[in-house]
Design a protein with these regions (language model features):
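Single conserved hydrophobic/aromatic residue that forms the stacking wall/gate
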Residues: 1-11, 15
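Lipid interaction determinants
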Residues: 19-149
Length: 149
């Protein structure tokens, strides 16, 4: 019957409207990321085939010191700061960052660059992933969850 089609069509419209409400923030990632982010959970591991006794893994809310990345402030001018968990700024206080697709590149200097993948971002939550594989088969993996500070 034609009524069935109308119902399906209506549900489709409602469904779309619904998801539009949830997607209220259509700004580019480079704008959404601006601000201060406070670490709330960190997990990851370090594996080194050459020194397996040094392998480690973690999965916990932040303690006194962060495992791999701390709190961040990203600024519109393309600079960022990383902070200790007690709020003090790290020595390398202001560095540059860029973003392409969903990858943030932290540029500490011409030799030190870190690529962080944005797994999730909402108005008050950010999940970043760092995954680095060495030539020797070793790997450093870290996943950090933040709340807006």
């Amino acid at each position: 019957s034609s009524r069935g089609l109308v119902d399906v069509y209506k549900e489709g419209v409602n469904f779309t409207a619904c998801s539009d409400d949830e997607e209220e923030d259509n700004r580019p990632l480079s704008e959404k990321i601006i601000g201060h982010w406070v670490l709330t959970y960190e997990e990851g591991y370090i594996k080194d085939p050459d020194y397996p006794e040094d392998d480690e893994a973690w999965s916990h809310a932040p303690k006194d010191e962060y495992e791999y990345f701390g709190n961040f402030t990203f600024r519109e001018d393309g600079t960022y700061s990383e902070y200790e968990l007690d709020g003090t700024s790290n020595p390398q206080s202001i560095e540059k960052w860029t973003i392409k697709d969903n990858i943030i590149t932290l540029i500490e200097d011409e030799h030190e660059q870190y690529e962080l993948k944005v797994l999730e971002i909402t108005s008050d939550k950010l999940v970043l992933e760092f995954d680095y594989k060495n030539e020797n088969g070793g790997e450093t993996y870290a996943k950090m969850t933040y709340k807006r500070g």
